[in-house]
Amino acid sequence: MSSQKQLEGMIFDVQSFSVHDGPGCRTTVFLNGCPLSCKWCANPESWTVRPHMMFSELSCQYENGCTVCHGKCKNGALSFNLDNKPVIDWNICKDCESFECVNSCYYNAFKLCAKPYTVDELVQVIKRDSNNWRSNGGVTFSGGEPLLQHEFLHEVLLKCHEVNIHTAIETSACVSNEVFNKIFNDIDFAFIDIKHMDREKHKEQTGVYNDLILENISNLANSDWNGRLVLRVPVISGFNDSDENISDIISFMHKNNLVEINLLPFHRLGESKWTQLGKEYEYSDKGDVDEGHLEELQDIFLDNGIACYVGHETAF
């Protein structure tokens, strides 16, 4: 009798020795798929669950006369200019399922940003790192939005807890109440993002309203869940750092007895990924958040009885 086929999940990265994604030294698993499309996103390759291609011009050897990818794309998405440089029609490329360009490239200039794992395969990768965690580490599921692949994630979480692996999640909480509650039954620690308290401004920069996000956070905070929750705010000057928005976050936290928040200053580390995906990065001219301003925001939270950590400074 054949065994039942295991669920597969799409993963775009697995990082060992992570020290900023929850208590202790951790393994962080990045799952594909996200309901948001934040204009500052550092991982835009994670937005879709299905595999898709990225192109790195810096890795491409077209200037040295390489032609191994010529004629490989049967869909007509790949052409070449007079300098032999690949030119990609992303509207055609986004529907590709064969990825001949990726398979032909010797230099990893074309690469896929999703890899399938079965439940057991991923759990084996996680367990492999367990000697690095010491006594207080574990696994953190990030993304993208890990809750989009909730069936796969649920099976992985169950197997992790079978062998007493501490589980954490980084999530936008932008999923149905049913999915959110089901997954959090097996979560020990959580970072949940709040991008903005105003629903219209939230939609303007992320593509979705924040009603479901705030509802899930509130429900979790008022449930019998016994894990640890830290809210996270990606601080972006001129978007969500106003006195009004900070005050609204504090009011929301007080209302729901939430006591910890992490302020993450905006950065442009993901800009090159947008280029590799053929996307325009609207935040290329956005400046860094002033350190003095971050300290002022931190003081406001502290003065209101909320533990506030800036950047990767956390109470682990």
UniProtKB/Swiss-Prot annotation:
<dbReference type="InterPro" id="IPR034457">
    <property type="entry name" value="Organic_radical-activating"/>
</dbReference>
<feature type="binding site">
    <location>
        <position position="34"/>
    </location>
    <ligand>
        <name>[4Fe-4S] cluster 1</name>
    </ligand>
</feature>
<dbReference type="InterPro" id="IPR007197">
    <property type="entry name" value="rSAM"/>
</dbReference>
<dbReference type="InterPro" id="IPR017896">
    <property type="entry name" value="4Fe4S_Fe-S-bd"/>
</dbReference>
<keyword id="KW-0408">Iron</keyword>
<dbReference type="InterPro" id="IPR040074">
    <property type="entry name" value="BssD/PflA/YjjW"/>
</dbReference>
<dbReference type="InterPro" id="IPR013785">
    <property type="entry name" value="Aldolase_TIM"/>
</dbReference>
<dbReference type="GO" id="GO:0051539">
    <property type="term" value="F:4 iron, 4 sulfur cluster binding"/>
</dbReference>
<dbReference type="InterPro" id="IPR001989">
    <property type="entry name" value="Radical_activat_CS"/>
</dbReference>
<comment type="subunit">
    <text>Monomer.</text>
</comment>
<feature type="binding site">
    <location>
        <begin position="193"/>
        <end position="195"/>
    </location>
    <ligand>
        <name>S-adenosyl-L-methionine</name>
    </ligand>
</feature>
<feature type="binding site">
    <location>
        <position position="66"/>
    </location>
    <ligand>
        <name>[4Fe-4S] cluster 2</name>
    </ligand>
</feature>
<dbReference type="InterPro" id="IPR034438">
    <property type="entry name" value="4-hPhe_decarboxylase_activase"/>
</dbReference>
<dbReference type="GO" id="GO:0046872">
    <property type="term" value="F:metal ion binding"/>
</dbReference>
<feature type="binding site">
    <location>
        <position position="267"/>
    </location>
    <ligand>
        <name>S-adenosyl-L-methionine</name>
    </ligand>
</feature>
<dbReference type="Pfam" id="PF13353">
    <property type="entry name" value="Fer4_12"/>
</dbReference>
<comment type="similarity">
    <text>Belongs to the organic radical-activating enzymes family.</text>
</comment>
<keyword id="KW-0949">S-adenosyl-L-methionine</keyword>
<keyword id="KW-0411">Iron-sulfur</keyword>
<feature type="binding site">
    <location>
        <position position="60"/>
    </location>
    <ligand>
        <name>[4Fe-4S] cluster 2</name>
    </ligand>
</feature>
<feature type="domain" description="4Fe-4S ferredoxin-type">
    <location>
        <begin position="84"/>
        <end position="115"/>
    </location>
</feature>
<feature type="binding site">
    <location>
        <begin position="40"/>
        <end position="42"/>
    </location>
    <ligand>
        <name>S-adenosyl-L-methionine</name>
    </ligand>
</feature>
<dbReference type="GO" id="GO:0016491">
    <property type="term" value="F:oxidoreductase activity"/>
</dbReference>
<feature type="binding site">
    <location>
        <position position="105"/>
    </location>
    <ligand>
        <name>[4Fe-4S] cluster 2</name>
    </ligand>
</feature>
<feature type="domain" description="Radical SAM core">
    <location>
        <begin position="20"/>
        <end position="307"/>
    </location>
</feature>
<keyword id="KW-0560">Oxidoreductase</keyword>
<protein>
    <recommendedName>
        <fullName>4-hydroxyphenylacetate decarboxylase activating enzyme</fullName>
        <ecNumber>1.97.1.-</ecNumber>
    </recommendedName>
</protein>
<keyword id="KW-0004">4Fe-4S</keyword>
<keyword id="KW-0479">Metal-binding</keyword>
<dbReference type="Pfam" id="PF04055">
    <property type="entry name" value="Radical_SAM"/>
</dbReference>
<feature type="binding site">
    <location>
        <position position="69"/>
    </location>
    <ligand>
        <name>[4Fe-4S] cluster 2</name>
    </ligand>
</feature>
<feature type="binding site">
    <location>
        <position position="144"/>
    </location>
    <ligand>
        <name>S-adenosyl-L-methionine</name>
    </ligand>
</feature>
<comment type="function">
    <text>Catalyzes activation of 4-hydroxyphenylacetate decarboxylase under anaerobic conditions by generation of an organic free radical on a glycine residue, via a homolytic cleavage of S-adenosyl-L-methionine (SAM).</text>
</comment>
<feature type="binding site">
    <location>
        <position position="38"/>
    </location>
    <ligand>
        <name>[4Fe-4S] cluster 1</name>
    </ligand>
</feature>
<feature type="binding site">
    <location>
        <position position="41"/>
    </location>
    <ligand>
        <name>[4Fe-4S] cluster 1</name>
    </ligand>
</feature>
<dbReference type="InterPro" id="IPR012839">
    <property type="entry name" value="Organic_radical_activase"/>
</dbReference>
